[in-house]
Amino acid sequence: MLDGLTYDDSESPSIALVPPGTSWEQVHDHIKIAHDFLLVQPVGSGYAGAYWTGTQMVVLEELGADQDEALDEFREQLGQRGEL
């Protein structure tokens, strides 16, 4: 489990902000247990969103380089996919 996550709950759903340097393996281990929506910033890349479908982790890449923009885009894509 990832410790010390901060959450953006300015809109629904609440999305956890993953600290820089967190590996995808750590993200997978956390999301498999907690089923949070996670915003991840991989090294050298824009933000990606990750969520658990019940059987696997899904990663939505290229949500933007700006955190606020990425949060908005992640929420929009979750809604379009029927995950909300």
Model-predicted regions and their roles:
Residues V40-V59:
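Short aromatic-glycine-(Arg/Gly/Cys) micro-motifs in beta-strand/loop hairpins
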Residues D8, L39-G44, E83-L84:
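Short glycine-rich, low-complexity/disordered patches
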Residues M1-A34:
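Negatively charged, low-complexity tracts enriched in Asp/Glu with abundant Ser/Thr
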Residues S23, H28, S45, G64-D66:
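Intrinsically disordered, low-complexity coil/linker segments enriched for acidic/polar
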Residues G4, A16, G46-A50, G64, ...:
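Small side chains
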Residues M1-L5, L78-L84:
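Short intrinsically disordered terminal tails
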Residues I15-P19, Q56-Q67:
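A short, exposed loop/beta-hairpin motif centered on an aromatic-Gly-Thr core
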